[in-house]
Structure formats: structure tokens, C-alpha cells
Amino acid sequence: MNTILIGIAGGTGSGKTTLTRHLKEHFGKDVTVIGHDSYYKRQVGRTYEERAKVNYDHPNAFDTDLLIRHLQELKAGRSIQCPVYSFVEHNRTDQTVEIQPAKVIIVEGILIFQNPTLRDMFDIKIFVETDADERILRRALRDVEERGRTLQSVVSQYLTTVKPMHEQYVEPSRKYADIVVLDMPLLDTRTKVGDLTGHLVSETVMEVLSFAASREHTTSERQAEGIR
């Protein structure tokens, strides 16, 4: 299977998941989506309070080696057992989800361009850039509503780990992107957010298709040269 591997990076709350969802809707059943968040390391022997204080925005928080091995398996046409992470418990669960190979594999996460080995696996690298104020608002809403966090804990985590790690690791990885998506203002009532989202996604889809076509053309040329 000639698999296209797409990486979508960007800061917390930048819109990575939204973009991923729209791309998946566009490409349909030929897409598999994997989140780097699923590969947070298991916190063995730590209490809930200790797990809550872990710096989850540092590269060492992730089992990226396992993700790399899983992507290699998928590209080779073999299914994987993807870990399941609980944001409520701050820990990996004992469950896994079977993921099948697909023509297009999308990997999303804040630090997927930070690791050179993982970064070099992507055929197309997309970075979603959004204003920091908008990102913290989105994160606060998400964590309070979906992950059982308090507003105080969200703000504390943002100031102590999220913001410093973004500046040290996430933002510098933007330079590796083939495509940079500038997200719309979250609270700008003067624009039609739905129209802007559709426009951004349409543009991104066209760029992805262009990169994919270019990649296939280059691969065909190399194969032809090998035959000669």
C-alpha cells in the first residue's frame, strides 16, 4: 500500500483536531487518524496528585518510540494496537484500540515535529498557528467541559508548563512545516466563522492534494529510473 503520512502540529487549542476532522471528512474511509496524546507514557506508581503535576508538554512525557514503530507497522500494511489515554485520570489505560492500515494516515499532536525520526516520516507536515490568547481560551473551555478540570488548574498548568514548553519546543518546530494554516479569531463576531473554517479547510485540502500528487510523481520518476 502506497501510504501518505500527514503530520498536523501546533500549540494546544490551535485547531489541530478541527482541521484533522475536516480532512478526514474530505478523504473519507481511506483515512486513519492517530493522536500523539494516545502515546503518553504510563505513570506507574504515582498517585493522582503526582500524575496531575507531570509536565505533559515536554517531549519526555511521550512514548514516541512506540508511535514510530506503530507507524512503520501501518505503512507496512499491518494493523496496530493503539494505546488509550485517560485525560481524567492522567494515565494510560489498560485498553487498546485496533487501527487498520489506510491510504492516508494523519498524526496530530503538539510535538510531532520535535522528534527528528518521527518528523522525517511525514510526507506532508502541517502546522496550525493560532493566537496565544485564543488558544488558552479554547483549552480552558475544553478541559473544564470535557476533562473534568477546574479553571484554576487549567490556568496554573498553562503558566507553569504549557506556555514555556510551547515557546521552547512547539513554536520552533513550525519551521519544519510544508504548510502553515493561520486559524481564524475565536471571538471575532464581524466574520462568519463557518465560512472562514470552510475556506481554510478547502485551501489546506488543495495544498495537501498538491503535495501528495508531487510526491507520487517523484516516486514514479525514481521507480522509472531504477528500471532503466
Functional labels for PLM-detected ranges:
Residues Q100-P101, K163-R228:
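NTP-dependent small-molecule kinase module
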Residues L5-G7:
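Short hydrophobic/aromatic beta-strand immediately N-terminal to the Walker A/P-loop
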Residues G11:
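P-loop (Walker A) phosphate-binding loop of NTP-binding proteins
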Residues E25-I34:
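Post-Walker A helix-loop "phosphate-sensing" segment adjacent to the P-loop in P-loop NTPases
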Residues K16:
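Conserved lysine of the Walker
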